[in-house]
Amino acid sequence: MPGNSPHYGRWPQHDFPPFKKLRPQSVTSRIQPGSDVIVCAEMDEQWGYVGAKSRQRWLFYAYDRLRKTVVAHVFGERTMATLGRLMSLLSPFDVVIWMTDGWPLYESRLKGKLHVISKRYTQRIERYNLNLRQHLARLGRKSLSFSKSVELHDKVIGHYLNIKHYQ
């Protein structure tokens, strides 16, 4: 009988921390800087928005092609400064080959490094962009689900990346 259960009519209690208290890390702990080499790293940016489509929020991240994991991520505007923050997070890692699409800022930032510019060699990270859009409704382009604050937008996506890739 449903009325006899002590939990009938009440939501189950979980010990999930509130999203505002989350402090997701921005770099993986699975790969040790200096001791492990990242042979192929793909870099890309993904568009999202907070509140209205005119308030754009970009996710920049690097993906280890062989380990199939995200190495580091940052949020911000689609500028050289945000790309620079991502590159500073990636500086402790030994990356042999960088693979990006044709965005000109990648070319200027990766000057002097082994850099492949091709849509063919960014298939995995582009596929992962689609996976993120499928798993996180707030990243969908035409959706009723969207982030209302920049803080929660960054924390929810960062927490997802922590669970899937960084632990």
Curated annotation (Swiss-Prot):
GO biological process terms held by the UniProt record: DNA transposition
Signal peptide positions on this chain: none
GO molecular function, one term: DNA binding
Keywords assigned by UniProt, alphabetized: DNA recombination, Transposable element, Transposition
Domain of life: Bacteria
PANTHER family listed in its UniProt record: INSERTION ELEMENT IS1 1 PROTEIN INSB-RELATED (PTHR33293:SF1)
Family: Belongs to the transposase 27 family.
UniProt function note: Absolutely required for transposition of IS1.
Protein's recorded name: Insertion element IS1 4 protein InsB
Taxonomic source organism: Escherichia coli (strain K12)
Gene designation: insB4
